Amino acid sequence: MKKLLCGLLCLLMLLGCASAEGYLYSAKGDNGLWGHIDEAGNWVIPPKFDGAGDFRGNYAWIQQGDREGFANRDGEIVLLLDENVVADSGYDGFYYGGRETGIWLLYKEATGKNSLGTEWLEGFFDVQSGVYSGLKWRGVNHRESNSRLIAVADETGKWGYVSRDTGEMVIPAKYDSDNMGSNFYDGYAVVTFWDDDYNIVQTLLLDETGKEYPLPEGINAAYCDSVISDGLFEVVDENGLYGYCNTSGEVVIEPQFAYAFEFEDGYAAVELTDGTCGVIDQTGNVVMRTTDSLHVQIRHGCYVLPTGEHSFTMYSVAGEELFTLQGENIVELWTPEENGLCMYVVEKGRQRRCGWVNMQGKIISEAKWTFPEYDQPGVYFPSGLQAVYDIDGTRLAGYLDESGELAIPLQFSFVTQFYGKLAYVGMVQDDGTT
């Protein structure tokens, strides 16, 4: 029998899930070494590494002795890093730049003062091209974008752009940022220049050739590292009022709000100058206004407002009241997932448990579950099943389906979400081992 990661690899074939051809999963062989299997459990890369992770794009993290590196789908080691270089795939379940489209962030702790004036040297390994940039930057923007350019900071702290296909700088580092630089979205990045007091004094739209487009006089990005969403980004005028520009550099929603958030699915949350909060459409029309002090989260055309003690109401962005959920100790109701299910949270003392309600307001699963903390937060039912822990009862884990039923019974000591057709799970054996 194959000895797989954490004891067992669940081989459920998920009906109706998206095609997962090409997924390869890390597994531990009888020889104590690691390789990769396909969805049928067949060895594709025989166990020969001291350590291995799942494939991201065309490459997988591997370890040989004290050195980390990467292997391709033929099992060939394409890069072995120096012993003190660390490859970081992400944190708290997030994959840097996306599982299939992103990077591994690489860094090396420097000994003593180095040319960057920082304790870390950073670089990246691209999951699609297999390009290793080398460790030569003060920072790398690992956030997701749909561009083959990535923002990096040089030794002065200025930001520019490197090709993920060559590892070479293509737009010189000269822009200011208080965080990670602005990545490209739909062909454009929002870049800024500061004064000596770190105030934004000029904002430009930048295309992928390096051409700069100024914004109208008196208009600047509302924040460093602005994200272009739905073709718009937040700006602020000389009076401190917020509005929106498009990727042509035109102000399409005049500055008029006390605060503004990015657009999603055609709508954005704003704070108005009278202290109320609301939702606007892409013309700037206020489609909802509330005196509630909480900023509204808009997702999949819906938002939630508290409507009493332990009571929450789901609305459409058109203002239609969809349903109200009320119950003892309910403290949160989330906007719907793509499958139309909404998570709600019950809090008793310091304990929080989650359940699910459909868009008719019917509870399909009582709030008694917690989720794997190492899976990507905010992503639920990724392949039609949701990994759950029964902390207060059996203290075991299983999988809910979209009807709220346990499709895979509570039997595991730990679980992960399904990726493709397989998920890693663990079971406690009779001798107490996992």
List PLM regions with ranges.
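Positively charged n-region of N-terminal signal peptides that target proteins for export
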Residues: 1-9
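Residue-level detector of conserved, function-critical positions
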Residues: 21-434
